[in-house]
Amino acid sequence: GVGFKAGVKDYKLTYYTPEYQTKDTDILAAFRVTPQPGVPPEEAGAAVAAESSTGTWTTVWTDGLTSLDRYKGRCYHIEPVIGEENQYFCYVAYPLDLFEEGSVTNMFTSIVGNVFGFKALRALRLEDLRIPPAYSKTFQGPPHGIQVERDKLNKYGRPLLGCTIKPKLGLSAKNYGRAVYECLRGGLDFTKDDENVNSQPFMRWRDRFLFCAEAIYKSQAETGEIKGHYLNATAGTCEEMIKRAVFARELGVPIVMHDYLTGGFTANTTLAAYCRDNGLLLHIHRAMHAVIDRQKNHGMHFRVLAKALRMSGGDHIHSGTVVGKLEGDRQLTLGFVDLLRDDYIEKDRSRGIFFTQDWVSMPGVLPVASGGIHVWHMPALTEIFGDDSVLQFG
């Protein structure tokens, strides 16, 4: 005999381990699980742990060639979601060895990969991740961080002000640059390429970069302040993206921009490394986030995408407004804003923080309040976001 029986077997025999003591090096995940009718929560939680780590639907002889105990994910705690029928929070611990160092891409491929299409689950949402210092230390994180950015800009003790150039599509490069100049000359710290602006027929990227650089230098000379424009380097290939970042560096501008979800984490980490090596700040836009995070019972909460961005690298990230035109709950927003900026964040379920997170010395990211805000929102925004933020109007 081969020492095992073939056939479909229950996951909970192997992957549900309520007695497990989590290790400091484990990556911990909190999932909101909605099992199919008739599937017990233990089986559903164990299935999540299995499918996102070493498990497959049956036993195979090659299982005997490794130590599954060392490499398997473990569902170590399950609790019902208060106020929801047939929903459970399932906590899963993953051994550190399952993940490639310095790769957000690999981390997500494992934790939020095939398991989300799993038949035994009606829906699945990743609510939070605890990233241990042993793993976060394998990432560079933000190219510069909040403190270095303030030193570069020589602006302290207040939120930074920005606006997005509108109409976002259709202006020629020359007129676009003119709008940038007027905004910066009028007192803003930053202007921004809309995320839709890459390199379209009506305005190619190189022309835009040139006229925006001119606007920056002219307004700097006239105001005596350091100015910036988020030049969108997002492109169809990594090579093209880096080419745009190189051109921005050659122009001597202070900051470039990237859409990190549509561009992908591999491209984002590549760009962040380039920005760090070349003294460019990196502004991150989150186009596509609502596809992933808007459903309450399926997908991923934005706090997970925010943590992933801090690891991958970015100096600014759009993080909702609470008061503008787009959706966002106040307490939960404050929770992930702290996760972006602070070194050490205590577990606090009222703010959606499922785990205590210790970033040790990884630089912080400035949250950007953007999306349908105007001057009447100022008092609320400064109260919610405090000094370390970018208020992005328009």
From Swiss-Prot:
Gene Ontology cellular-component terms listed: chloroplast
Keyword terms: Calvin cycle, Carbon dioxide fixation, Chloroplast, Disulfide bond, Lyase, Magnesium, Metal-binding, Methylation, Monooxygenase, Oxidoreductase, Photorespiration, Photosynthesis, Plastid
Reaction equation(s) it catalyzes: 2 (2R)-3-phosphoglycerate + 2 H(+) = D-ribulose 1,5-bisphosphate + CO2 + H2O; D-ribulose 1,5-bisphosphate + O2 = 2-phosphoglycolate + (2R)-3-phosphoglycerate + 2 H(+)
Residues where N6,N6,N6-trimethyllysine is found: 5
Cofactor note: Binds 1 Mg(2+) ion per subunit.
InterPro entries: RuBisCO, RuBisCo_large_chain_AS, RuBisCO_lsu_C, RuBisCO_lsu_C_sf, RuBisCO_lsu_fd_N, RuBisCO_lsu_N_sf
Superkingdom of origin: Eukaryota
Coiled-coil ranges (or none): none
One Pfam family this sequence matches: RuBisCO_large_N
Residue numbers binding substrate: 114, 164, 168, 286, 318, 370
Active-site residues per Swiss-Prot or TrEMBL entry: 166, 285
EC number: 4.1.1.39
UniProt-annotated site: Transition state stabilizer, residues: 325
Cofactor(s) the protein needs: Mg(2+)
Subcellular localization(s) per the UniProt record: Plastid, Chloroplast
PTMs per UniProt: The disulfide bond which can form in the large chain dimeric partners within the hexadecamer appears to be associated with oxidative stress and protein turnover.
Residues with PTM N6-carboxylysine: 192
Biological-process GO terms, alphabetical: photorespiration; reductive pentose-phosphate cycle
Coarse class of the protein's main subcellular location: plastid
PANTHER family assigned to the protein according to its UniProt record, in alphabetical order: RIBULOSE BISPHOSPHATE CARBOXYLASE, RIBULOSE BISPHOSPHATE CARBOXYLASE LARGE CHAIN
Chain's role: RuBisCO catalyzes two reactions: the carboxylation of D-ribulose 1,5-bisphosphate, the primary event in carbon dioxide fixation, as well as the oxidative fragmentation of the pentose substrate in the photorespiration process. Both reactions occur simultaneously and in competition at the same active site.
Other noteworthy facts: The basic functional RuBisCO is composed of a large chain homodimer in a 'head-to-tail' conformation. In form I RuBisCO this homodimer is arranged in a barrel-like tetramer with the small subunits forming a tetrameric 'cap' on each end of the 'barrel'.
Subunit structure: Heterohexadecamer of 8 large chains and 8 small chains; disulfide-linked. The disulfide link is formed within the large subunit homodimers.
Protein's name according to its UniProt entry: Ribulose bisphosphate carboxylase large chain
Organism this protein belongs to: Alisma plantago-aquatica (Common water-plantain)
